Amino acid sequence: MGSVNYQTIRLSKGKHRSPEDGACVMELASMLAGEQFSDHPVSVCPVIAALLRSYNDSIDDRRRQDLYGYASKVVGSRAGLTVERARAERLTAWTHERRPPRRTRWLMPGRLRAFAPDPPVHILAARAIQALPAHDDRTHAEVLGLVEELLDLGRRSGPPSVARTARTDRLHALT
């Protein structure tokens, strides 16, 4: 059997030590970007990466294979703090559209909440995936639509990044 590469790898759950062990969608993105094999590729927006890692690990194998194209789409999506913050806010709003936040007497008063730190992006992503009532074709399309929305937030913010415009032909082979 030949060596595993971005064209022959099969997406699977979890974190992997090497491509020979398999890859999640973000590990594939790191391969496509020419980065060190990792589920936290430098060239990918942390908000989008967290969402795709959580989603990759929560869906069945058939739907997971639909994420191949997104591995290439997200390479070069890392942007400035303003875009990252806008993406995190959209992810939070999307989550609340599916499952409004619970109100309890234990919540901080509004004036104190303004000083509370925002949750890390991996928590926001996990909450978004947990807000899905089921993993079916409808919710699958919704999550993929959200990824497109998050990518668009970066595209509208200004000219494309050097990383995005310098993609190799192998990235386009997947889309």
Regions found by a protein language model. Give the residues of each.
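Structured binding/interaction patches within domain cores
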Residues: F37-T175
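Active-site-adjacent bridging/hinge elements
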Residues: M1-N5
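Leu/Val/Ala/Ile-rich N-terminal alpha-helices, chiefly Sec-type signal peptides and the beginnings
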Residues: Y6-A50, S58
